[in-house]
UniProtKB/Swiss-Prot annotation:
<dbReference type="Pfam" id="PF02822">
    <property type="entry name" value="Antistasin"/>
</dbReference>
<dbReference type="InterPro" id="IPR020901">
    <property type="entry name" value="Prtase_inh_Kunz-CS"/>
</dbReference>
<keyword id="KW-0732">Signal</keyword>
<protein>
    <recommendedName>
        <fullName>BPTI/Kunitz domain-containing protein 4</fullName>
    </recommendedName>
</protein>
<keyword id="KW-0722">Serine protease inhibitor</keyword>
<feature type="domain" description="Antistasin-like 1">
    <location>
        <begin position="31"/>
        <end position="56"/>
    </location>
</feature>
<dbReference type="InterPro" id="IPR036880">
    <property type="entry name" value="Kunitz_BPTI_sf"/>
</dbReference>
<feature type="domain" description="Antistasin-like 4">
    <location>
        <begin position="114"/>
        <end position="143"/>
    </location>
</feature>
<dbReference type="InterPro" id="IPR050098">
    <property type="entry name" value="TFPI/VKTCI-like"/>
</dbReference>
<feature type="domain" description="Antistasin-like 2">
    <location>
        <begin position="56"/>
        <end position="85"/>
    </location>
</feature>
<keyword id="KW-1015">Disulfide bond</keyword>
<keyword id="KW-0646">Protease inhibitor</keyword>
<feature type="domain" description="Antistasin-like 3">
    <location>
        <begin position="85"/>
        <end position="114"/>
    </location>
</feature>
<feature type="signal peptide">
    <location>
        <begin position="1"/>
        <end position="19"/>
    </location>
</feature>
<feature type="disulfide bond">
    <location>
        <begin position="155"/>
        <end position="179"/>
    </location>
</feature>
<dbReference type="GO" id="GO:0004867">
    <property type="term" value="F:serine-type endopeptidase inhibitor activity"/>
</dbReference>
<dbReference type="Pfam" id="PF00014">
    <property type="entry name" value="Kunitz_BPTI"/>
</dbReference>
Length: 198
């Protein structure tokens, strides 16, 4: 046998193990006598038995620079990292219906605990058509229409009406033109006071 050919390709492959009476015994199989004289930078492709065949392996995964992913990256069919982020895998989802949503755990996955009602039930003395919202979006007992400016409108009728003056905190008389009113337009002073005065 030519020494060069012998040096280029000779392999013994371990193809598996099995247990007999509690002890582990290795089964070995000599890989076929394929002779390959080509030099492969990344080694040879292995067959189904784990023995090299006369075909060079592709280059390892390309070096990729990706933005950070909170849950890691998707791995492609070749075992290489992609720049696609893995989605959050929450596993089983709770089947309890929560009208205001579920409280998330530390990973952001929904738990079986419901969020509380975000806004308190209002107990206002006055009824508003549109309530003023607070900083977290919950309605207050203030009426939006009371915050609107006095609006006479473009028409020329002189209809006595009342509006709530935010600056003075009082309901004042004005003459409405008869068209294009806003919400701060009341027929009687008592209506204005009931709706807008605290």
């Amino acid at each position: 046998m030519n020494l060069l050919v012998f040096f280029v390709y000779l392999x013994v492959c371990v193809i598996g193990s099995h247990s007999i009476x509690g002890s582990q015994q290795l089964s070995t199989k000599k890989c076929g006598g394929a002779i390959c004289a080509m030099a492969c930078t990344y080694g040879f492709v292995l067959d189904k038995d784990g023995c090299p065949i006369c075909k060079c392996r592709d280059a390892p995964c390309p070096l990729v620079k990706c933005l950070p992913c909170k849950y890691g990256y998707v791995i492609d069919d070749n075992g290489c990292q992609t720049c696609e982020c893995k989605p959050l895998d929450c596993g089983l989802v709770c089947l309890i219906y929560c009208p205001y949503g579920n409280i998330p755990d530390e990973r952001g996955c929904p738990t079986c605990f419901c969020r509380p009602r975000p806004c308190k039930e209002l107990e206002c003395e006055k009824k508003c058509r549109n309530n003023v919202l607070d900083e977290i979006g919950c309605p207050t007992c203030k009426c939006k229409e009371c915050l609107e400016p006095k609006k006479v409108g473009p028409c020329r009728a002189l209809i006595p009406r009342y509006f709530y003056d935010v600056w003075s905190g009082k309901c004042k008389k004005f003459y409405w033109g008869g068209c294009q009113a806003n919400g701060n337009n009341f027929k009687r002073k008592s209506q204005c006071c009931k709706r807008c005065k605290s």
